[in-house]
Structures are given as structure tokens and as C-alpha cells.
Amino acid sequence: MLHNLIAEFLSTGLMILFGVGVHCDEVLTNTKYHGSGHIFAITTWAFGISVCLYIFGGVCMNPARVLAQCALGMLPWTSFIPYVVAEFLGALVGALICFVMYKDHFTESEGNVNPIAIRNIFSTNPNCRNLPRNFFVETIATTIFLS
């Protein structure tokens, strides 16, 4: 079990390092790929996820996948909380590493870049706040992700 938890921690951290890193590069001032666009970002995310799956094998890297695997009997329910904690901590460490790597760019971007764009490096929110529809969209996206 410890081996699996370490794999979840490292794979999730590496995935977030790719994903948050590309958004830092795309959004923050004076980065090499500033303004490179959405296609660059999603391609880097896809590459990062693929690399993590190749290196670490059958990892989940997402609590929704852990929940689905527990529900399908592929993982015991006793693994749910430890896996989610390992993934959460891995994501936190990956985001923290990105913040430290791009700290000078964050400082330089203050006042020059929309604060919402900077916040969206680490999180997202709906442009149109309609909670039932937002929930529906996330449900469909998660279902597609799980299949």
C-alpha cells in the first residue's frame, strides 16, 4: 500500500507541476511562452498526464477516479481516504513548487495581469454562475474523464 500511496503522491505532484507550470508560463508577465494560448496549455496538460501514467502505471491521480475504482470493486474502500490524502498532498506540493519556481514572475505580474487570471492558474470557476448547470457540466466532464 505504501508503494501505491507514494506513486499517487508523486504522479499527482508531477501532473500538477506540468499543468500549473504551463498556466504560469502562459499567464504571467515575462515568461517564455506568455500568451501562447489555450491549445498550448491543453497539449501540455495532456502530455503531463501521459508522462505520469507512463512512469507510474495504474495510478488514479484524481479522487474521482479513486471513488470510481472503489465503487467498482477495483480498490478496497479502506484505500479511499489514504489515496485521496496522498493525491491532495501531491497536488499541494506540485502547486507549491510551481509557485516557488515562478515567484519572481508572480511579483512582476502584480498590477499588470488581471488578478482573476492569476487565481485561475491554481483554480477555476464558472463564468456564468448557475449552480445546477455548473454541477451538470462538472458531472458530464468527470464522467467523460472516468470513461
Language-model segment annotations:
Residues 1-147:
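Membrane-interface helix-loop junctions and terminal tails of multi-pass membrane proteins
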